[in-house]
Design a protein with these regions (language model features):
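The substrate-binding groove and active-site-proximal loops of carbohydrate-active enzymes
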Residues: 4-16, 37-55, 99-120, 145
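Aromatic-lined substrate-binding rim segments of carbohydrate-active enzymes
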Residues: 20-100, 124-127
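Short beta-strand segments
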Residues: 8, 35, 73-74, 138-140
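Short, well-ordered coil/turn segments that N-cap beta-strands
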Residues: 1-5, 30-32, 64-70, 132-137
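Tryptophan-centered motif/residue detector
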Residues: 14, 19, 41, 139, ...
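Active-site region of glycoside hydrolase catalytic domains
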Residues: 65-67, 79-172
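An acidic-aromatic substrate-binding cleft motif
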Residues: 1-18, 24-32
Length: 172
C-alpha cells in the first residue's frame, strides 16, 4: 500500500456544489487519502433496512476521479435515531445509573444484541456495495473506540453480557 497524507472529510455536512472544489483543493495540497462516512449511518440507512448509498457513491467517484484514494469508515459509532426509538434499552448507563442520551456518538451499550445485529447487517451491505470499488484503499472499522469514556455501561444488558462471557470463558 502506498503511503501518503490523509484527511477526514464529511461531505454530508457540505453542499454538493462544494465537493469538487474541496477535493481539488485536497489534491493540490498533496493529500493522498480521504476518510469518509464514519458518522453517516443515519444518511446511509434512514429507516431500518432501507439503504441509500447515493451520496457516498457520488463523493467516492469525485475523490477517485481526482486520483485520490478513499478510506471508507463503517459508521457504527453513530447509530441513527430510529434505532434508539426501536430499542430505548440500547442506551448505555453510566456509573450514576443515568442513560447516555442520543445526539453524540457512542450512545449505545455494546452488549445490546440488536445493536450488534444492525451493525453486522450494515457492514455486510456496505461490503457488498463498495467492496469492488477501485477507488477504495482501505476500510476503517468503527471509529474512536473507547473515546469520551463511552465503552463502559452499567446496564443490566452489559451485566448479563459479561456473565455470559464469563460462563463461556471459565467453565466452573
Amino acid at each position: 500500500m502506498r503511503r501518503g497524507l490523509g484527511v477526514c472529510y464529511y461531505p454530508e455536512q457540505w453542499p454538493k456544489s462544494r465537493w469538487k472544489d474541496d477535493v481539488l483543493n485536497m489534491k493540490n495540497l498533496g493529500i493522498s487519502f480521504v476518510r469518509i462516512a464514519e458518522f453517516s449511518w443515519a444518511m446511509i440507512e434512514p429507516k431500518p433496512k432501507e439503504y441509500n448509498f447515493n451520496l457516498i457513491d457520488e463523493i467516492i467517484d469525485i475523490i477517485g476521479k481526482n486520483d485520490l484514494k478513499v478510506v471508507l469508515g463503517t459508521p457504527t459509532a453513530a447509530p441513527p435515531s430510529w434505532m434508539i426509538e426501536l430499542y430505548p434499552d440500547m442506551l448505555p448507563i453510566n456509573q450514576s445509573g443515568l442513560a447516555r442520551q442520543f445526539g453524540s456518538r457512542r450512545h449505545y451499550c455494546f452488549s445490546h444484541e440488536k445493536f450488534v445485529e444492525h451493525c453486522e447487517a450494515l457492514v455486510r451491505v456496505m461490503a457488498k456495495h463498495f467492496g469492488e470499488n477501485p477507488y477504495l484503499a482501505a476500510w476503517q472499522i468503527d471509529n474512536e473506540y473507547g473515546c469520551h469514556d463511552t465503552t463502559i455501561s452499567y446496564s443490566s444488558l452489559a451485566l448479563a453480557g459479561y456473565r455470559k462471557w464469563l460462563k463461556k470463558r471459565f467453565s466452573n
